[in-house]
Structures are given as structure tokens and as C-alpha cells.
């Protein structure tokens, strides 16, 4: 088995999907979790305005609405959380996403004071915080906030990790990589777009240039520039297609470099890293 085949098997990506069928798979997955753990009464998700959170958010809202209808339990809620750092340049995109998702509850928590306070405390202790490191602090603060909200709403936190992101490790460890459920796992970027189109999303949501937007020195830096490879190549790779040797080498280098992000903390019984 080639490395490409091993990766595809681990990520569970299908070369061809039926968007309507995959929507039902994700919705049922979320509902099954609620049925298994009846003390969980909500799903919580941070909404950035990009493709991934828009899709995960809409799927979660559908699942919650179906649970309310099937159980007659009005306490089930989907909570969407805006998590800007100061004034968010793409706030209009976030509002467009919220209009599409139609969440039961919409909150906004500005993380700037918390992040700046953490950086100041580190500086006071003699620790210099690089722009890159501060970006990771932002991602982790956003998850701290979502788990606090989940505590209020008896909720589980959703993540937006998908195959095209997972393969490159393009997420912050214990930041946006930390969640309870991943309804998009198994889908690559273009498949996520197909689901959004099937759900009737404004094309502006899934045509937006993907960016983590964590570094202040590189505002709006496109994911593809940061990775050095296009999502089209990543998607082709995860679908088992032949791509250029250069793109293939970059993707596989990211996979190998970020293995630690796809595992729980390493114990003496783990050997994937050796």
C-alpha cells in the first residue's frame, strides 16, 4: 500500500460523493451522539464566516431541529459563537454565515482582552511571544471560550476539521484541533463546497478564499500560500488521483511533520512517532 493509499484510508475520503447523502450522514451522526448521551442538550461552534464553520453550523442546526421535532424536547439548542479578535475585518462574511445557519442562539465573545492579557503575563515572566505563537494563543482562547459556553448550555463542542485540513495538520493543537465531534471528517474541501451548494448556501460563503487569519503580521494570509500547495491538489490527492510530484511531496511532508497533531498525547505504548 502506498502512503497515499494509507492516508486516504485513514481519512476515509471517497473519490465520489452524493452531497445529499453525506448531509444525512453528518446529521445522523450528530443526532446519534445526542441520543446516546441525553444529558447533552446543545452543540456549540465558533463561526468565522468561512466555508467550514458555515457547513458544520448548518448541519448542527438541522440535527438539533430534527431532535426537537422527534423528541418534543424544546431544550435542544445549537449555539453559534462569534469569536472576533478586536474588530474582525471579515465580519460581513460572518454575518452572512449566521444568516445561512439560522442558529437557535447566537453569541459574540471578543477574545482580544484575554489574549492580550495572556501575552502580557508571559512578557512579564520574560517569555517573548512571536506573532506565530500569539496566533496559536488566539486559536486556543477561542476553544476555551467555546467550552465555557458549552458548560453553560450542557453542550458538546463541534470542530470543523476535514480531510484537506487534517492531511496537512493545518490547525492549532489543542486549539481549533480540540473538539468533541467532527461532523466534516471524511470530506475534502471541494466536497464541503458541494454540500453547501446542496444546502442552498450563498456562493460567497464557499467561494471565499480560505484563511486562518491568526498572524497580525500576515493578515488574511491564504491557506494555500501558507501551505505551499493548492486545495485542488490536496483534494485530488485525497481522492486517489495523480498530481504533480512537487505537490505530492509537499502534502506527504506535511502529513509526516504533523503526525503528532492527529494523536492523543504520546505514551510509552505509542510507536507512530518512532
UniProtKB/Swiss-Prot annotation:
Record field: catalytic activity: deamido-NAD(+) + NH4(+) + ATP = AMP + diphosphate + NAD(+) + H(+)
Family matches, as Pfam families: NAD_synthase (PF02540)
GO cellular component terms, A-Z: cytoplasm
GO BP term, example: NAD biosynthetic process
Keyword Ligase: yes
Keywords: ATP-binding, Ligase, Magnesium, Metal-binding, NAD, Nucleotide-binding
Binding, ATP: 46-53, 160, 189, 211
Pathway in which the depicted protein is active: Cofactor biosynthesis; NAD(+) biosynthesis; NAD(+) from deamido-NAD(+) (ammonia route): step 1/1
Residues that bind deamido-NAD(+): 140, 173, 180, 260-261
Highest taxon in the source lineage: Bacteria
A molecular-function term among this protein's GO annotations: NAD+ synthase (glutamine-hydrolyzing) activity
Residues binding Mg(2+), per UniProt: 52, 165
Known EC number: 6.3.1.5
Primary role: Catalyzes the ATP-dependent amidation of deamido-NAD to form NAD. Uses ammonia as a nitrogen source.
Complex and partners: Homodimer.
Family, per entry: Belongs to the NAD synthetase family.
Name this polypeptide is given: NH(3)-dependent NAD(+) synthetase
Source species taxonomy: Bacteria, Bacillati, Bacillota, Bacilli, Lactobacillales
Amino acid at each position: 500500500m502506498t502512503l497515499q493509499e494509507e492516508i486516504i484510508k485513514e481519512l476515509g475520503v471517497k473519490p465520489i460523493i452524493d452531497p445529499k447523502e453525506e448531509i444525512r450522514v453528518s446529521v445522523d451522526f450528530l443526532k446519534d451522539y445526542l441520543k446516546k448521551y441525553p444529558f447533552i442538550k446543545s452543540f456549540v461552534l465558533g463561526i468565522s464566516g468561512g466555508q467550514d464553520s458555515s457547513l458544520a453550523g448548518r448541519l448542527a442546526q438541522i440535527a438539533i431541529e430534527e431532535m426537537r421535532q422527534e423528541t418534543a424536547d424544546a431544550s435542544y439548542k445549537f449555539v453559534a459563537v462569534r469569536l472576533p479578535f478586536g474588530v474582525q475585518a471579515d465580519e460581513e462574511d460572518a454575518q452572512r454565515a449566521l444568516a445561512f445557519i439560522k442558529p437557535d442562539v447566537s453569541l459574540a465573545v471578543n477574545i482580544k482582552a484575554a489574549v492580550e492579557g495572556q501575552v502580557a503575563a508571559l512578557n512579564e515572566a520574560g517569555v517573548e511571544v512571536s506573532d506565530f505563537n500569539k496566533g496559536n494563543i488566539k486559536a486556543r482562547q477561542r476553544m476555551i471560550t467555546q467550552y465555557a459556553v458549552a458548560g453553560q448550555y450542557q453542550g458538546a463542542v463541534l470542530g470543523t476539521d476535514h480531510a484537506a485540513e487534517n492531511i496537512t495538520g493545518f490547525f492549532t493543537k489543542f486549539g481549533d484541533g480540540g473538539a468533541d465531534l467532527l461532523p466534516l471528517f471524511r470530506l475534502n474541501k471541494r466536497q464541503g463546497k458541494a454540500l453547501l451548494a446542496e444546502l442552498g448556501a450563498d456562493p460567497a460563503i464557499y467561494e471565499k478564499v480560505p484563511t486562518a487569519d491568526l498572524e497580525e503580521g500576515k493578515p488574511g494570509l491564504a491557506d494555500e500560500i501558507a501551505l505551499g500547495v493548492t486545495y485542488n491538489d490536496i483534494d485530488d490527492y485525497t481522492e486517489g488521483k495523480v498530481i504533480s510530484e512537487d505537490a505530492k511531496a509537499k502534502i506527504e511532508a506535511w502529513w509526516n511533520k504533523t503526525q503528532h497533531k492527529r494523536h492523543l498525547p504520546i505514551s510509552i505504548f505509542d510507536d507512530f512517532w518512532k
